[in-house]
UniProtKB/Swiss-Prot annotation:
It holds the Pfam family RNase_PH_C. The keyword Transferase applies. Keywords: Nucleotidyltransferase, RNA-binding, rRNA processing, Transferase, tRNA processing, tRNA-binding. Phosphate binds at R93, G131, T132, R133. The lineage of its organism: Bacteria, Bacillati, Actinomycetota, Actinomycetes, Bifidobacteriales. This is Ribonuclease PH. NCBIfam families: RNasePH.
Length: 248
């Protein structure tokens, strides 16, 4: 069951195959970093804003700060949802995903090399078909790199290569009808017995593993298979990041 790679999914992929990934840099003009990431039918705009100075609680520490915000457009999904700003309250899911993105990016930044400067990432989901948080991490990293390179060019930091310690990306995995699969679209995610999001660095270490059993508990063998799938997917996503960043 765990090694079955002959199953063909509804979208024609193998169980260990990513959806088509496209990363477009310089998607908008104003931000220091701006990326559109497309993972299948999921599309997220990720922007990075570099600001000299840090929040009050970080002042005089000699350290920088990286933070993130996540949101979805009202019609990113099949049915319209009100903007959270209109409702007057940021939802728990939004807070959770924003913190996830921030943690993943901070995990590959040398805050001392960044100095007392702040980089804010904004991840706005234009179209959602599963994996929006993982696409946000993967796209936001590329926007972050562009912002750090901008800061070096404008002499806000000494060395971009010192600030950027490693790559980071994230991907979803899950167990569907007893079979572990990589990179779940919404139709699979909604049926998953186990759903997991895994963020990894370019050196193969983990920053985040979020895993939940929905319909039945998962066993140790399935966990190992899911992590193997996530490692494969993240290596391929980081190859896509490198390819996008090599275009200048």
């Amino acid at each position: 069951m765990l090694g079955n790679h002959q199953i063909i999914r509804a979208d024609g992929r193998k169980v260990d195959e990513l959806r088509p990934v496209r990363i477009t840099r310089h998607f908008t003009d104003a931000p220091e970093g701006s990326v559109l990431i497309e993972c299948g039918n999921t599309r997220v705009m990720c922007t990075a804003t570099f600001t000299p100075g840090v929040p009050r609680w970080r002042k005089d520490s000699g350290l920088g700060w990286v933070t993130a915000e996540y949101s979805m457009l009202p019609r990113a999904t099949a049915e319209r949802t009100d903007r959270e700003s209109v409702r007057g309250k940021i939802g728990g899911r939004t807070h959770e995903i924003s913190r996830l993105i921030g943690r993943c990016l901070r995990g590959v930044i040398d805050m001392k090399a960044l100095g007392e400067n702040q980089i804010q990432l904004d991840c706005d989901v234009l179209q959602a078909d599963g994996g929006t948080r993982t696409a946000s991490v993967t796209g936001a990293y590329v926007a972050l790199v562009d912002a750090v390179n901008w800061a070096e060019k404008h002499r806000h930091i000494k060395s971009a290569s010192r600030v950027l310690k490693d790559y980071v990306s994230a991907v979803s995995v899950g167990v569907i009808n007893g079979t572990p699969m990589l990179d779940l679209p919404y139709i699979e995610d909604s049926q998953a017995m186990t759903d997991m999001n895994v963020a990894m660095t370019g050196s193969g270490t983990f920053i985040e593993i979020q895993g939940t059993a929905e319909h039945r508990p998962f066993n140790r063998a399935e966990l190992g298979t899911l992590l193997d799938l996530a490692e494969k997917g993240n290596k391929e996503l980081q190859a896509a990041q490198r390819a996008a960043l090599s275009l200048d």
